[in-house]
Amino acid sequence: MAKIDKSLYTKDEWKVLKAQRKANKAQRNLNTTLQPSQVLVKGLEEKNYIMCLKHGTKYSSDYVNKLYNGVLRHCTIDFEMVCLTDDPRGLHPNIKVISLPAGLQGWWCKPYMYSKDLPINGVVLYMDLDVVIAANIDKLFSYQPDNWCTIRDFTRAMRPKWPKYNSSIVRFKVGQLDSVWTDYIRDPKAVQRKHFGDQDWLFEATRQQQAMLYPDSWIQSWKWE
């Protein structure tokens, strides 16, 4: 495992990261002796996941593979790569494929990633395929570990107090935001008429379970900032 640059973290963040790594090591040791009857959720051990979504032809499998390679270079926490897609051709063999339900289109595929019925168990760090990773991302897993996290929409560059979310990076526990999916799929057309896109819907659907926002300086837009 690569050495972590301690200078990237505050004192409190470093304590959280050390605790996270210690817990991960203990969990890995536990998993080696765990009997099937002791695995309580879905029969799956808990993992950290990097998730992306590829639908249609806007982004090729190369984008998925490049994102995977970027995470390998810049993450020292054990993870599994997951891609939600309607076409798995060309993906790296280490990437776990989850098929998208039929009928979803464009950014309205995104609510599916919050479903509790995905065949995974643990913590998901979702990234859009146009995200470029420039530094270590361990703290995206360790920041505010008891909450779900996302970033402020990049309208913040023009309106500093802008409260709405940008769904290009979201971290959550599997099943934690299941209602974002179930409330959407109950009447997709009604949601689409009222909300411009998936991140507007995410903001509305989680009003009673608001996100902790990553610091603006951690994730920035090359276009707006």
Question: Language-model segments: which ranges?
Answer:
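Basic, mixed-charge low-complexity alpha-helical segments
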Residues: S7-T32
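N-terminal anchoring/stem segment of glycosyltransferases
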Residues: Q27-G106, P119-I120, V174
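Residues that flank catalytic or metal-binding motifs in active/ligand-binding sites
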Residues: E46, I77, P93, K110, ...
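Short, hydrophobic beta-strand segments that form beta-sheet elements in well-ordered domains
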Residues: I77-D86, V124-L125, W148-I151, M212
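A residue-level signal for conserved active-site and pocket-lining positions in enzyme catalytic cores
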Residues: M81, Y114, D130, V170, ...
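GT-A fold catalytic core of metal-dependent nucleotide-sugar glycosyltransferases
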Residues: R89-H92, V97-S99, P111-W162, F172
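A short acidic, often aromatic-flanked loop/helix-cap motif at beta-alpha or helix-coil junctions
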Residues: R89-L91, A102-W107, R156-M158, W218-W224
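Catalytic core and acceptor-binding pocket of nucleotide-sugar-dependent glycosyltransferases
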Residues: V174-E225
